[in-house]
Amino acid sequence: MKSVFRFTFLLMLVVARVFAQDSYQELGKKALLDGNFKLAVVQLEKAMVADSTNLNALYMLGYSYYHAEDYKKSVAAFGKLISLKPSETSAYYYRGKARSFMANYTPSIANSEREKLLLSAIRDFSRAIDLNSDDLKYYQNRAIAYHDYGVLKAQKIPRLYDKPRAMEALKACIIDFQKVLEANPGRKDIATQLEEARSHLQNVSKQ
């Protein structure tokens, strides 16, 4: 009798845990779809407490952190997702974008930290391209990261300035932008960014 009672009690605990996890996940999903990313974070964090390996909840949590502009936590969430599912292409993409935002918009960020973030973003976009070479937004975002890195390394600041690396990054940026523009000739925004990259490369080559 005691064994039956214990089994029933444990079963009820498992069912309650699964129900709580599903409820929080569904509430988080609804908030996400409604564009209320901060509320989505609250619910999805609870879902992760119930099951820290829930890939769907983890993806939505990283996505919600990103759109709530909590880029550091977004990077951490997508990093965990990648450790559980290395083939999740979108996780690399959003982690790369989060790192790019951190590099460019973190107040008083050190140049050394900005450099690390941009290089990490480039690696993330490159990995996304390895997994799905047909999605042009990966090339576009890698081009932007290459551009930002090239401009950073072109600054004549001790222990930062590196003309060869700056030129290499800007050339890579141009190649990626050209690929996007060839597939979408009407993209004036890409054409403008491409010309800016060419101009920066020309200026750096004269330094």
Task: Kindly label every feature range from the protein language model.
Residues 46-47, 80-81, 127-128, 180:
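Canonical positions in the second alpha-helix
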Residues 33-34, 67-68, 101-108, 148-151, ...:
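Register position in tetratricopeptide repeats
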